[in-house]
A protein has these predicted regions:
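Generic structural detector for well-ordered beta-strands
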Residues: 30-34, 79, 104-106
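A structural signal for short, hydrophobic beta-strand segments that form beta-sheets
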Residues: 60-63, 77-82
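N-terminal post-signal-peptidase region of extra-cytosolic proteins
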Residues: 74-76, 87-92, 98-103
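Alpha-helical transmembrane signal-anchor/signal-peptide segments
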Residues: 24-39
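A solvent-exposed interaction/effector surface
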Residues: 16-21, 37, 41-48, 55-66, ...
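Ser/Thr- and Asn-enriched, surface-exposed coil loops between beta-strands
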Residues: 83-89, 111
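Hydrophobic membrane-insertion alpha-helices, especially the h-region
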Residues: 4-20
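Absolute protein N-terminus
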Residues: 1-3, 24
Length: 314
């Protein structure tokens, strides 16, 4: 009777192995992230860029000494190959395991990208081997999840992608005393601060207070003239005067970044902010501007300047 019971239990165990472990084990990771297809492709399809977010610090070089398409993680090798704009084939190697996986990505909603990483692992008819293959598939899924987490954690940080930390905020300064002048040459720092000081003088006369650093926008027309717009945030409405207007801002959304450095650094920040707006399909209803945190007259060393840059969005 005991022998019969043992045989029955063994048969049940074997049957359960074949019932619960399929002939093809599907391993997949599916995530959604607020990003763009351009960013996903840039950091998945480039050997150099993959090194920036890969969770293991170990690098594999090819025969020429360049960064290889093969990356190592916990004893598994991942060989990225046959990539295009929204598709990447990854060969996964671990001892006897050598199998292709597929990473795809597409637009889920306006700024939400769905990323899928899938692999199908065939199993053996040998029950012991089948169990080991199931355990290895479970371990592989865990590794894929951690790799995906590392990738997503990297690309959602704007500092990693654009070189600057961008924040979306609500406009706080809604009352501005503004000045608009045109010149044939690029406005010098002293000219800018002369205009700022003229506005401040008028504020004192009217008993109004400046509540934040002065704002600046310089643009060049097709004819080559430079338009200098200065805006000083103030605490209340005051009468306009010749050369100084009082404008009301809608408390809408705005993208903000803090820049350290001179005009070149600020221009680079605006270029990257433009790319950020394009990636996330954001539209600007108004001109961008700088907030002069550092007094540029008192601090002639441009490398020490701190400037906040802003882009209104909706």
């Amino acid at each position: 009777m005991r022998k019969v019971l043992v045989v029955v239990l063994v048969l049940l165990c074997l049957a359960s192995i074949y019932i619960f472990i399929p002939n093809q084990i599907m391993v997949s990771e599916v995530e959604e992230v607020e990003s763009s297809e351009r960013i996903i492709a840039k950091y998945l399809n480039s050997n150099e860029n993959r090194q920036k977010w890969w969770p293991s610090s170990k690098q594999i070089l090819d025969s020429t000494g360049l960064q290889s398409s093969v990356l190592d993680y916990e004893g598994y090798k991942f060989d990225f190959r046959n990539s295009n704009y929204n598709f990447n084939e990854v060969l996964i190697i671990n001892n006897s395991l050598k199998i292709n996986s597929i990473i795809t990505w597409d637009l889920s909603t306006k700024n939400l990208i769905r990323i899928r990483w899938k692999v199908s692992i065939p199993t053996s008819y040998n029950p012991v081997t089948r169990v080991f293959q199931y355990l290895r598939a479970h371990r592989l899924k865990s590794h894929m999840a951690l790799i995906m987490e590392s990738f997503l954690g990297f690309i959602v940080n704007s500092k990693n992608v654009y070189g600057f930390h961008f924040e979306r905020e609500i406009v706080q300064d809604t009352i501005l005393a503004t000045s608009n002048t045109i010149s044939t040459s690029y406005p010098k720092t002293l000219e800018v601060y002369n205009r700022i000081n003229s506005i401040k003088k008028y504020l004192r006369e009217q008993g109004a207070n400046q509540v934040n650093p002065a704002m600046l926008n310089i643009s060049k027309s097709e004819q080559g003239a430079f338009q200098l717009i200065i805006a000083v945030p103030i605490n209340r409405i005051i009468p306009p005067v010749q050369g100084i207007l009082i404008n009301r801002m809608v408390p809408g959304n705005i993208v903000v970044a803090q820049i350290k450095g001179g005009p070149h650094s600020v221009a680079k920040g605006f270029n990257q902010m433009n790319l950020y707006l394009k990636d996330f399909k954001l539209v600007s209803p108004a001109m961008p501007f700088q907030s002069l945190i550092t007094d540029r007259v008192d601090e002639p060393d441009t490398s020490k300047w701190i400037t906040k840059i802003y882009y209104p969005i909706f």
